[in-house]
A protein has these predicted regions:
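Conserved beta-hairpin
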Residues: 353-372, 379
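Conserved RecA-like ASCE P-loop NTPase motor core of nucleic-acid helicases/translocases
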Residues: 1-4, 138-141, 166-179
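Walker A/P-loop nucleotide-binding motif
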Residues: 137-150
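Terminal substrate-recognition subdomain of acyl/acetyltransferases
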Residues: 196-200, 208, 220-224, 232-338, ...
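Conserved coupling/interface region of RecA-like P-loop/ASCE motor cores
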Residues: 70-121, 245, 255-298
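Conserved RecA-like ASCE ATPase "motif II neighborhood" in helicase/translocase motors
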Residues: 7-39, 189-228
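Hydrophobic positions on the alpha1 helix immediately C-terminal to the Walker A/P-loop
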Residues: 151, 155, 436
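N-terminal accessory nucleic-acid engagement/regulatory domains that precede
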Residues: 14-105
Length: 645
């Protein structure tokens, strides 16, 4: 049995993955994370029990639990209770159904080496594909608890046993923990786990490469694997629903591209559960509560024309009272965004800074845009945040502009950030996304600026440009799942915003060429030529490099928390001008500066040359090293807090 809190990061429960338990108890007195609930449900064997310890019915949620959704200037009292009431109603329905049930849930038979007959067929199909013609790509998609990973491992074990000569088989996954089930069932075959970022170090191509939980990996990285080893037999497996992620990015982007290739991929699926019975009541209850089956609304074939769609703001009390509308909303979000998670359900229902804008054709929801209101902070609070003092939850746009882009005053502006935007697949390319954005602009006419932060693609950047937005910052690393750098785009709505944000476009024009080169050296720039072109073409003239602007930028980097790559265009010339002072620094600090700033070496080499244990240590060492060089250059303390021009 496992006893755990209902709140906290989902990763806190992931250590139990792979276990099959008689019972899991979630103490939900302080609150209940949908992601933790989803994980817990998947741990319980057929015939077992998931126990939720809830406070008395209709009791107010614990303020400590509500605080997780608080964003300045809101308090716990401003957080909604819609998710909590939905949970109470769902628990009541489950208890009533159980009280009137005539039979207990079926207990599946004991697990056999081949699992279900369906799994045995999939194992044989995997063996056939992975021992067949070179260059074959195989895709295995399954829901949780279907034996996907064990099927992969069993297939690898049998491939080794049947092979006339030794095979080089490699497994990769988001983490070693995520691959343990494959490796366990592959034993005793000599299958090696290699992290995704270490695959480049392989001296020879593997005969077979298995990618488990592929939806958790960047799509460009998956595409690159196919291009790098065209003759290897590759198998991509992923979970399509649940806490592992919806898998929509994998299906909508990677698999769609793979289907256009020659030869097309061999597609397999697993539907029958192994650890519990078909139509298991606990799985059905969790699916319904967490909207795992959510799909966009059904549209009539000869329905109304898209241009007649009605724009409006969704009332969240009415939304939670209408299961059909709530499911349609999440169906839109899940189908359009690979990052949608079960915890987004709580945020959409209860976060006090969110507004949901919608487009409807008749009764059908055909578009949605989630907006977060941010900023409006005091100048003192902004200055402290820019110095790295404290954290700002829920203000992603304001925080990025202040602490990363160097526009400290941006936090004082009232901002409206587009968190998600989605349009029904059946009516895309009909101007509805632009209609949504126009509606947002009209509804939030009192804000200083509109903005959005997203994994950059040429198509979305162009769309935002048509809506009047401009890129003002590009992230310095690839997104964990998109594989693309993030981009910040803003549209000014008041003269004050235009004045405050004016330096950002020329600053990005100055920063981006060197930033991109440094990211490419690290393997973090997966942007295609189209994205690179659309970003570069829209930039303003680069900000001039004067003695004052360089000194201000270096002081901002040294005194804050912004990553080096975004400020390298200023730090490098300043260090070059003061290189004579490096010998006076601590040898390790001087080595880090010489390797990263002057030689532009990748972080891994910087760590090696400076005698540091790894990349994170090298990255942490650079800022204090530059700060020490600033002190040697005898810059005044006041200059370190100035905002760069």
């Amino acid at each position: 049995m496992l006893w755990a809190s209902g709140l906290g990061p989902a990763r806190g429960l992931r250590g139990a993955l792979g276990q099959t338990l008689d019972a899991v108890v979630l103490d939900a007195h302080a609150g209940l994370s949908p992601e933790r609930l989803a994980i817990a449900e998947g741990l319980v064997r057929g015939g077992g029990a998931l126990v939720l310890r809830l406070p008395p019915e209709c009791a107010a949620p614990d303020p400590l639990g509500q605080a997780a959704l608080c964003v300045e200037p809101f308090t716990a009292q401003d957080v909604g209770t819609r998710w909590w009431r939905r949970l109470e109603r769902a628990c009541g329905a489950a208890w009533i159904e159980r009280a009137h049930a005539e039979t207990l849930p079926l207990i599946p038979p004991a697990f056999a080496p081949t699992g279900t007959p369906e799994q045995a067929q999939v194992i044989e199909a995997l063996i056939a594909h992975l021992s067949g013609e070179p260059g074959v790509r195989t895709v295995l998609i399954a829901e949780r608890g279907r034996g996907k990973s064990s099927a992969l491992g069993a297939a690898l074990a049998q491939l080794h046993a049947r092979a006339p000569a030794p095979l080089c088989c490699v497994v990769t996954a988001p983490t070693l923990e995520a691959a343990r089930e494959v490796l366990r069932f592959a034993a005793p075959a000599p299958v090696e786990f290699v992290a995704l970022d270490a695959l480049d170090g392989l001296s020879t191509a593997p005969d077979i490469l298995v990618v488990d939980e592929a939806a958790q990996l960047p799509v460009p990285a998956l595409t690159a694997l196919c291009a790098r080893w065209p003759e290897a037999r590759l198998a991509f497996a992923t979970t399509t629903r649940g806490y592992e992620g919806t898998g929509r990015g994998f299906v909508l982007r990677f698999l769609a591209d793979l289907r256009q290739a020659e030869p097309p991929p061999r597609e397999l699926s697993l539907t029958a559960p192994i650890r519990w019975a078909v139509d298991d009541p606990l799985e059905a209850w969790t699916r319904a509560l967490l909207l795992f089956e959510a799909e966009p609304a059904q549209l009539e074939a000869a329905g109304e024309r898209p241009e007649r769609a009605r724009a409006h703001v969704l009332d969240r009390d009415a939304l939670v009272a209408s299961p059909q509308t709530l499911s349609a909303l999440f169906g839109l979000l899940v189908h359009a965004h690979y990052r949608t998670t079960p915890d987004d359900l709580v945020r959409v229902l209860d976060a006090p800074n969110l507004t949901i804008h919608a487009l409807s054709l008749g009764d059908a929801l055909v578009g949605a845009c989630v907006i977060a209101v941010e900023g409006g902070l005091t100048a003192e609070r902004c200055a402290a945040l820019a110095r790295g003092e404290g954290r700002l939850r829920g203000h992603a746009l304001a925080d990025t502009l202040m602490t990363q882009a160097g526009c400290v005053e941006a936090g004082t502006l009232r901002l409206a950030r587009s968190v998600r935007i989605a349009v029904h697949p059946a009516v895309r390319r009909a101007g509805l996304a632009s209609r949504l954005v126009e509606h947002v602009h009209a509804h939030h006419a009192d804000v200083d600026a509109f903005g959005t932060v997203f994994g950059a693609t040429a198509e979305v950047v162009r769309f935002r440009q048509r809506c009047g937005y401009h890129a003002v910052r590009v992230g310095v690393s690839a997104g964990a799942r998109s594989g693309e750098p993030s981009v910040v785009m803003v549209r000014c709505n008041t003269p004050r915003a235009a004045q405050v944000l004016a330096p950002l476009r020329p600053r990005l024009a100055r920063a981006l060429p060197l930033q991109r080169a440094l990211m490419q050296a690290e393997g973090h720039w997966h942007a295609d030529d189209a994205l690179s072109a659309v970003l570069s073409d829209a930039l303003a003239a680069p900000a001039p490099l004067t003695q004052d602007t360089v000194a201000e930028a270096v002081a901002f980097y040294a005194g804050g928390a912004a990553p080096y790559e975004g400020w390298a265009a200023w730090v490098r010339p300043w260090v070059e001008a003061h290189a004579r002072l490096l010998d006076a620094l601590d040898p390790r600090a001087a080595a880090v500066i010489r390797a990263r700033v002057l030689a532009a070496l990748p972080w891994r080499q910087v760590a090696h040359l400076a005698g540091l244990p790894g990349v994170p240590a090298a990255q942490r060492a650079l800022r204090p090293a530059v700060r020490a060089l600033l002190a040697r250059a005898d810059l005044t303390p006041s200059s370190r807090s100035r905002t760069p021009s």
